[in-house]
Amino acid sequence: MKKRKSRTEVKAVAQYIHMSAHKARRVVDQIRGRSYEETLMILELMPYRASYPIFKLVYSAAANANHNMGFNEADSFISKAEVNEGVIVKKLNPQARGRSYTIKRSTCHITIVLKDRTKKEPTSILERRYGWVDEYKIKYSR
């Protein structure tokens, strides 16, 4: 069964970020559930290297919300933020006497979901399925 797109949330994904997922999770755990403006202030002041790509991703998610859905950034908050492990890039480092050792470079995928506080999620089945509710069906459905 295909999941319908929500009208109250916007998602932005950054893939193959050259960073450990453990280090990125340390930053993402600090911003989960906070408002958009508060998140930007926190990320600007954090001393971690992971905060810059997450800052860019939150900014991009807000731009998507404003352009595609017409959300106001002041009403947005981060409803879901997750970091998953990506592929491990392996490179060869040449050593003495013809040997070589592998360098493992870990990557991660970061997902940020913004939700608007002012917009409500549709409650009835008709509203979720068709986007509208007929007055007749509301009156005589009981």
UniProtKB/Swiss-Prot annotation:
Q: Which residues form a coiled coil?
A: none
Give the matching SUPFAM superfamilies: Ribosomal protein L22 (SSF54843)
Sorted alphabetically, which Pfam families does this protein's record hold? Ribosomal_L22
**Family note:** Belongs to the universal ribosomal protein uL22 family.
State the CDD domains in the record. Ribosomal_L22
Q: Which UniProt keywords apply?
A: Chloroplast, Plastid, Ribonucleoprotein, Ribosomal protein, RNA-binding, rRNA-binding
Q: Which GO terms describe its molecular function?
A: rRNA binding; structural constituent of ribosome
> One cellular component GO annotation, for this chain's record?
chloroplast
Family matches, as InterPro entries: Ribosomal_uL22 (IPR001063), Ribosomal_uL22_bac/chlpt-type (IPR005727), Ribosomal_uL22_bac/org-type (IPR047867), Ribosomal_uL22_sf (IPR036394)
**Where is this chain primarily localised?**
plastid
State how it assembles: Part of the 50S ribosomal subunit.
Name of the coding gene: rpl22
The GO annotation for biological process reads: translation
- Function, in words: This protein binds specifically to 23S rRNA.
* Localization (cell): Plastid, Chloroplast
Protein name per its UniProtKB record: Large ribosomal subunit protein uL22c
